[in-house]
Structure formats: structure tokens, C-alpha cells
């Protein structure tokens, strides 16, 4: 048992450095090509001329597509192992290391160039990859899946500063057959990754800064639960739209470079209306939480960002949709809150409360993981007083979504790439 805890600690450290490496590579490319040192792609897009804002995501997609197509042609005669931690957990726990690194590099290109896709997907992949590499050298084969799970949880903890949610992500979403006793090493890896990540970044701040002064009362619980119902209906719709967009891009029968370039071009066109469509949505979420905009502004940015996310994910841009889903949920919750605010005197607080609820419940509706989704929002924002209400709302959203759409976003992803 102590051997496992020691290995879990090492895996957590490796994962933290893997995440930090991707983050610093991203900052370097942003500085080199976008002359941006703020760490915000929205700021980068704002400072670019319109033609550069239009073409940059397309060029990034083209470069990533050429990289992926070139690697595919180079290795077409080789047997293929999984290049995704979800696939590796469902098979024999082995990775195609070179292909996974190429996929991560392609993700770096599309993320840095502004595509509306999550950078955290590549971070978690690299963390799981580092764990797998260590495990194959120093642990028996029957433990490989456990250490990949630890690496993925640690990567999520380092990326989102949410170790408990990262651990439950593994338990609820990826490793449902995992025995409860195996959660110990997963939690150790996640916590160690967070601590090492804090040391690397010289900060232990929460991922999102929120000033919510509301005391949750009976009326607020009713609003939170109703938001859960709304998210339970919106989750399957979002998954259906993502499926439809993917099929639409595939039906065009374009080569990968042109398919990714088209997705990037759509993002570029949308960014002419608002630069907020660039990136995974982190900075836009933070700005909304700091000062909730008016109803029409939220609606406009929401529609543009939704189309950008659908274009990026549908075109096959390598990356995650976890953080973009958080923004979509926030916008849905805030739109609902702004509508209700017309009848309540404390409309600002309701908008903020339901925005946070929307983040958690849409995440639960798309992942079918209500406990993880609840803890994720609480850990990212520090608003633990919302825990009881969010848990109820997330369970409701998950049940409704599962009834309407059998597969979660991750099962849908696995089926699409199998």
C-alpha cells in the first residue's frame, strides 16, 4: 500500500510538470505569434487587426491538420495503440506515445491560434501520458490502468485546481469499474499535482474569482432546482448539435488540414463580431462572473461562442470541450437569471447565482457525473455554501439528460473515435 502511495506521489509530480509544460508552451507561442503576454486569447484577439483575427484560427487549424495528416501517412503501416487516455483505460492501458505527443502538439497549435476548444484536454492527456510512461517502466502490467487514471486525475487537478473533482471525474466518468479502494492513489496524485502546480505558478488562487454575497434561502433553492431542469433539457440538445456538426464536417469529405482550417475560419468570422469567441472561454467566464452583462450582451456572446465551439469541435480540432461547456452553462444560467431578475429586486445576485448553477448543471447534463460537477464548481470558485443546492440540481439535470440522451459527452467521444 505504501508503495502505491509513493508511486501516486511521483505521478502527481509528473502530471503537474506536464500541465505546466503545455501551459508555458502556449504562453510562448502566444507571445511569439500574437504579441500577447497577458495569457488571455480574448485580449490577443482584441488587439489584432480584423484580417489577422479572421485568418489566425484558420491558419492554426491548417497547420494542425497538416501535422496530423503527415503523421498519419508516415505511420499508416504501423499497428495503432490508443492516443487518448479514455481509450487507454478501456483497453490494455497502453499508449501510442509518439502519436499522442503529435496530437498534443496539434492541440497546442489550434488552441494557441484561437480555436474555441479546451486546452485542458491536451493537458490531461500529457499528464496521463507521463504517468503511463513511468508506470510501464516501474510497475507491473496489471497496474497500468490505475496509474493512467491517477495521471488523468492529477492533470485535471492541476489544470482546474480541483483535486476532489478530478478524482471523482475518474470514478464517475472514466473508470466506472474501478474498485473504491483504488481511489486512494488517485486522490493522492490529484492533491500532489495541485500542490506542485501551485509551487510552479507561485499562486494558490482559485481558478475563478467570484463575489457572491447571497445567503441561499428557500426561494433560491427553487431557482437552483429549476435551473437544473433547464440544463437537463439543454444538455442533450448540445450533444445533439455537436454530433450534427461533426457529421456535417465529415460529409464535406475534406482532407484534415482543410477541415480544421474551415472550422478555424468560422471561428475567425465570428470573432469579427466579438473577440470573446477566441479560446476555451476561461477569460470570458471570469469577466461574466466579475460583472454580469446585460441580457442582450449575454445572448449575443452566447450565440457566437456556441457556434464557435460547434465549429471547432465539429471540425475535429484536437482539444477538450470541458471548459467551453462551462461557459455555455454559465451563459444559459445567466440568461435565465436575467429574465427572472425583472421580477426580483436582487437581480444581480440571482443572475450570478444561476450562472454558477448553470455551469454545474450543464456539466452534469453532458458528463452524467453530478457529484463531480458539483464539486468542480465549488472547488473552482470557493462557493461551498452552494453545495447542497447544486448537488440536488446536478442530480436532476443528469437524470433528465440521461433519459433524453443515453450517452454522455465522453461516451459519445469514445464511440466517435472507436
UniProtKB/Swiss-Prot annotation:
Lipid bilayer topology: Multi-pass membrane protein
UniProtKB keywords: Cell inner membrane, Cell membrane, Chloride, Chloride channel, Ion channel, Ion transport, Membrane, Transmembrane, Transmembrane helix, Transport, Voltage-gated channel
SUPFAM superfamilies linked to this entry: Clc chloride channel
Gene Ontology BP, a term: response to acidic pH
Entry's Gene Ontology molecular function annotations: voltage-gated chloride channel activity
Spans through the membrane: 5-25, 54-74, 146-166, 168-188, 222-242, 258-278, 291-311, 316-336, 352-372, 380-400
GO cellular component terms attached to this protein's record: chloride channel complex; plasma membrane
Main location: membrane
Keyword Mitochondrion: no
A Pfam cross-reference name: Voltage_CLC
Localization per record: Cell inner membrane
Coiled-coil regions listed: none
Keyword presence, Cell inner membrane: yes
UniProt record similarity statement: Belongs to the chloride channel (TC 2.A.49) family. ClcB subfamily.
NCBIfam families: PRK01610.1 (NF002437)
Functional description taken from the UniProt entry: Probably acts as an electrical shunt for an outwardly-directed proton pump that is linked to amino acid decarboxylation, as part of the extreme acid resistance (XAR) response.
Identification of the protein by name: Voltage-gated ClC-type chloride channel ClcB
